[in-house]
């Protein structure tokens, strides 16, 4: 599957930077907000970028390996949390309402029948992946279907005028899948990128390490993104990667959440490296593997709040900073318009 992603044309860099520098402030005084404004301008190819119809997509899916005790919570919590999202009661709902972000939940592969519901897209590939400790998590056909469906979802948002999408996820056991994918695609030691997830105690963490070692003994360490995704991925991770790639094809800004979302980005970036300039990294998760992922990508997140919830909460919390970067570039007076002396 080919994705047509073009790198942002750097030809506008000087013009956008000049506009930033002429605002009524010392050079660089707004720090990383200035860098973010430049990034938005390059993504949108304008010196006056605007955020339109921003949207958070929360991808949900179940993992066969969860039944082996790889998580602190039972698998049923996946569908129960989807119900919580649909009822508006989760943390991501609260933060999206606060910032007037639209929120849609994507059933990528939850082991539950939700029926037709407002705010839910039924994109179920299957009711959960296979147990990757025993067999590949998904077939090549399932993987490709998930990638394609994610791409379609992003393109549909673009048609409706959206130019910024935040990514979130829900799936009991998906931190383990993210650890395996990160290990495969970066070569970072598995122990370094394996943490407590939803709150494993010491015994649970030791069990998680054993189970992931068993998975690797069976499936090896495929370094190609499609192979790694089929062996160890989740349907929500695969569909999210497809949506990221589709969003970048449409020159949308991608607001990246924490550890699991970044594992999907590692897949997407390995497929199409040109995706990276479209990404804004919301925060640094407390999950230890996230710091390793960010270092591998050589990026710095906007915030460090010790978050480890997922759901897209970090993306929703970071959105006002992205909006502020666009607003500053468009609405702040320049030395010329304000009649302020800029001589040093």
Swiss-Prot record:
CDD domains hit by this protein: DMB-PRT_CobT
EC annotation from Swiss-Prot or TrEMBL: 2.4.2.21
UniProt keyword list: Cobalamin biosynthesis, Glycosyltransferase, Transferase
GO BP, sorted A to Z: cobalamin biosynthetic process
A GO molecular-function descriptor: nicotinate-nucleotide-dimethylbenzimidazole phosphoribosyltransferase activity
Keyword Acetylation: no
InterPro entries: Nict_dMeBzImd_PRibTrfase, Nict_dMeBzImd_PRibTrfase_bact, Nict_dMeBzImd_PRibTrfase_N, Nict_dMeBzImd_PRibTrfase_sf
Reactions this protein catalyses: 5,6-dimethylbenzimidazole + nicotinate beta-D-ribonucleotide = alpha-ribazole 5'-phosphate + nicotinate + H(+)
Pathway: Nucleoside biosynthesis; alpha-ribazole biosynthesis; alpha-ribazole from 5,6-dimethylbenzimidazole: step 1/2
Active site, UniProt feature: 311
UniProt xrefs under HAMAP family: CobT (MF_00230)
Stated role: Catalyzes the synthesis of alpha-ribazole-5'-phosphate from nicotinate mononucleotide (NAMN) and 5,6-dimethylbenzimidazole (DMB).
Family: Belongs to the CobT family.
Protein name: Nicotinate-nucleotide--dimethylbenzimidazole phosphoribosyltransferase
Gene name per UniProt: cobT
């Amino acid at each position: 599957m080919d994705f047509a992603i073009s790198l942002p044309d750097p030809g506008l860099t000087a013009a956008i930077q000049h506009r930033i520098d002429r605002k009524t402030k010392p050079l660089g005084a707004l720090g990383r907000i200035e860098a973010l404004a430049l990034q938005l301008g390059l993504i949108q190819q304008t010196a006056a970028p605007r955020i339109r119809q921003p949207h958070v997509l929360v991808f949900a899916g179940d993992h066969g390996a969860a039944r082996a005790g790889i998580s602190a919570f039972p698998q049923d919590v996946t569908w129960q949390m989807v119900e919580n999202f649909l009822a508006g009661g989760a943390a991501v709902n609260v933060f999206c309402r606060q910032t007037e972000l639209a929120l849609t939940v994507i059933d990528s592969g939850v082991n539950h029948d939700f029926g037709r519901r407002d705010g839910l897209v039924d994109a179920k590939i299957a009711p959960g992946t296979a147990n990757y400790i025993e067999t590949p998590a998904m077939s090549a056909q399932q993987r490709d279907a998930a990638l394609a469906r994610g791409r379609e979802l992003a393109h549909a948002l673009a048609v409706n005028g959206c130019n910024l999408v935040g990514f979130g996820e829900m799936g009991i056991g998906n931190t383990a899948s993210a650890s395996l994918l990160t290990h495969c695609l970066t070569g970072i030691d598995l122990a370094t990128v394996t943490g407590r997830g939803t709150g494993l105690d010491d015994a649970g963490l030791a069990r998680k390490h054993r189970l992931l070692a068993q998975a690797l003994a069976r499936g090896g360490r495929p370094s190609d993104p499609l192979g790694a995704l089929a062996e160890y991925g989740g349907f929500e991770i695969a569909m999210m990667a497809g949506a990221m790639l589709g969003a970048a094809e449409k020159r949308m800004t991608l607001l990246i959440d924490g550890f699991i979302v970044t594992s999907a980005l590692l897949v997407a970036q390995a497929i199409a490296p040109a995706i990276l300039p479209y990404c804004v990294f919301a925060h640094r998760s407390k999950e230890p593997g996230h710091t390793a992922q960010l270092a591998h990508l050589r990026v710095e997140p906007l915030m460090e709040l010790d978050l480890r919830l997922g759901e897209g909460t970090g993306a929703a919390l970071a959105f006002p900073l992205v909006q502020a970067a666009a607003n500053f570039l468009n609405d702040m007076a320049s030395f010329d318009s304000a009649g302020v002396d800029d001589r040093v």
